[in-house]
Each structure stands twice: as C-alpha cells, then as structure tokens.
C-alpha cells in the first residue's frame, strides 16, 4: 500500500518507499514491517526506514506495546486513540479505531472521543485510562488522586506499560506529523480541516 501525497496535498516530505527501493541497511526492517503491518511500509514506517537502526528499535518497542503489553488490548487501543485524538493524527486514528472496536471498545466511546468529547458511559477501567492518559499528556504529571484510582484497577506493571503506550504513541504522532503522512488514497481522513 502506498500513500501518494502528504497530508497537505503537496509533494511528500519523504517519498513513499517501496520494498524494491530499500538499500541493504533498510531491507531487514522493511521485511519485518511487511510481516506485521496492515499498511505495509507506509504510515510511520516510511520515515522510520530513513533511520533503520532507530526504526528497528522502535519496531521492537511497538511489538511489545501492541502484542505483549500487560494492559488489556481494549484499554491499550483506547489509550492509543486518546493520543491520536489529542494530536488529530489521521493515520493513528485510521489505523487504531478499527482495532479498538474489534477489541471491544464501544462505538459510542470511539465516536465521542473522535468528536473531542469526554466519552460518557465508560466502564471503570476505561475512565481510569481516559483520566490517566489525558492528565499525563496535558498537565505533564499524574496527581495523587488519579494515581490512586489507577492503582485500584491496575497493577504496577500495567501502570508502567500504560504510561509507555501513551508516550510511544505521542512519538508516533510526532513522526507522522513531521512527515505529513496521511491515510491511503481514496480513504476519508478521520479529522476534517478546521475541526478542533
């Protein structure tokens, strides 16, 4: 899958690579990405391939935070969507909203979050994730009451993993924003220009 233009519709900052274009330092990373990514080497992988050593380390981190994390997948994907919405990251939302729905996150929660609202009717664990991730990313700290609520729902490893998921997907959103990556051709961007 290739993405033709940048998010702004102008020439791409990083032209989309194909597997045939990868040099010897990029090829092993590209092959690993192709095995696990439903968007191939597009999205964040396109700029990551420009720095293959970093890209490999990030891919290892992504693997843990997506498939081996101690945070239940529904909540993990919810945390990713919270970051995607904060950053209005077209690719993050495009890639993860279906995964969140498949993992059992209620469509109403996804829709309200996408609209920029605090979701209503969240389960206790979802409320904890929303409050924790939102507080950490907006105030740059976690208050004692928020931490205490998190400790009632999650163990220490889960709290650390949740923090890492949030931080990782801020980095992914930054990478996507820097490269002006967007959704595949013919697909509707989740966030419209001018929306808050």
What is the predicted function of each stretch?
Residues 2-196:
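Hydrophobic alpha-helical segments
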């Amino acid at each position: 899958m290739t993405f033709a233009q940048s998010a702004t519709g102008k020439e791409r900052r990083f032209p989309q690579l194909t597997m045939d274009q990868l040099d010897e330092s990029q090829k092993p990373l590209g092959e690993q990405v192709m095995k696990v990514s439903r968007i191939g080497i597009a999205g964040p992988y396109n700029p990551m391939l420009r720095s293959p050593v970093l890209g490999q380390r990030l891919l290892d981190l992504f693997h843990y935070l997506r498939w081996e994390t101690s945070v239940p997948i529904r909540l993990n994907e919810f945390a990713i969507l919270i970051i995607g919405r904060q950053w209005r990251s077209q690719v993050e939302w495009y890639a993860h909203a279906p995964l969140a729905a498949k993992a059992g996150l209620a469509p109403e929660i996804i829709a309200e979050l996408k609209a920029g609202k605090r979701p209503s009717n969240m389960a206790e664990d979802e409320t904890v994730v929303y409050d924790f991730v939102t507080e950490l990313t907006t105030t740059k700290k976690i208050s004692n009451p928020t931490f205490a609520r998190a400790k009632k729902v999650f163990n220490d490893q889960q709290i650390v993993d949740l923090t890492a998921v949030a931080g990782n997907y801020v980095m992914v959103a930054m990478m996507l924003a820097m490269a002006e990556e967007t959704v595949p051709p013919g697909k509707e961007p989740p966030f419209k220009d001018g929306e808050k």
